[in-house]
Every structure is written in C-alpha cells, then in structure tokens.
Amino acid sequence: MKRLLIVEDDPGLQSQMRWCFSDQIEVSVAADRDSALTALRRMEPQVITLDLGLPPDAGGASEGFALLEEILRLAPMSKVIVVTGREDKENAVKAIGMGASDFYQKPLDADILTFVVNRAFRLAELEQENRELIGQTNGASIKGIVAASPEMMEICRTIEKVAYSRPRLPLIPDEACH
C-alpha cells in the first residue's frame, strides 16, 4: 500500500490533507521535527509533504530545512513535496535545490495537491521498478547492451574482444580475389 507522511503543524490543514488521501493511501501526520522523524522511521513513506514553517520557527523556514536535510539523509528514495505559503517561492526553489522532488503552494486545493502527490508516488514507483530491473541484470551491461542470460553475456564479451582487436590478416576486397 502507498504510504504518505504529512508534516504540518496546523491542525486544520492536517485534517484537510489527511481527508484528501485517507481512502486510498496509508496516511500518517506529524506536527514537528521529532514526530516527523519518528513517523519516517516507523512507516517508511514513499512520499512526504513537508511544511517548511514548523515550530519552534513557525514563522521562518529553518526548522523545515533542517528536517528536509534529515529526511533526505535517512530516506533518500522518499519523494519530498515542500508545502509553502503563496509568497514563498524563494524557499521552495531552495528546497528543490537541496533535493526535494516538488513543491506545492498554499492555500489548499484538494485536486491540485492530489495530483502533485500522485505524481510523486508514480515517480517513486518508476524509480523502484528501475532499481529492480537493474538488479535483475546483475549489473550485466556491456557498453550499453543489457543482457540477462549467461549465453548472451558471453556473446557480448566475444564481440567486445573482437571489436578492439587488430586483424592479423589484411582485409582484401572481394573483387581482388577474382
């Protein structure tokens, strides 16, 4: 099941955001940095919405940025969507530069937020699928050719050897032989 962590200190927004997703996604809510880190470790969410204005610096973004750094260190595969105020594009851009996947500007619009969160889930799914496919090839890639079977790997190695070897006999055009 998809897992979403909502980090928001405003109880009204918490309940609105939870309402947007609770029927299709496992949702956990945290109001501050410590509870967010506890929930992150407990539920291992694929997607996290993070309000940058968290206590004790609810008017600023320092606590949100500190939490973003910790999330990216502890759960680098999670997709973080930074939630900002309408006039706060500068912090949103800074968060993207730090490694957040996307941003969403308040006020809450359930349709747009749902779209942004579902897009983040899809990106997380595609990245996981890509990691699994790479694992299935056991790193068996030769110069951009992906082969899974041992026989194909042997053919690729032979081609690689021949491609870089110098011919011992000069190549003579066909018409010179007649």
In which residue ranges do the predicted regions lie?
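His-Asp phosphorelay/catalytic-motif detector in bacterial-type signaling
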Residues: 44-46, 73-79, 166
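Receiver (REC) domain switch/output surface
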Residues: 113-124, 159
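AAA+ ATPase active-site-proximal loops
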Residues: 135-178
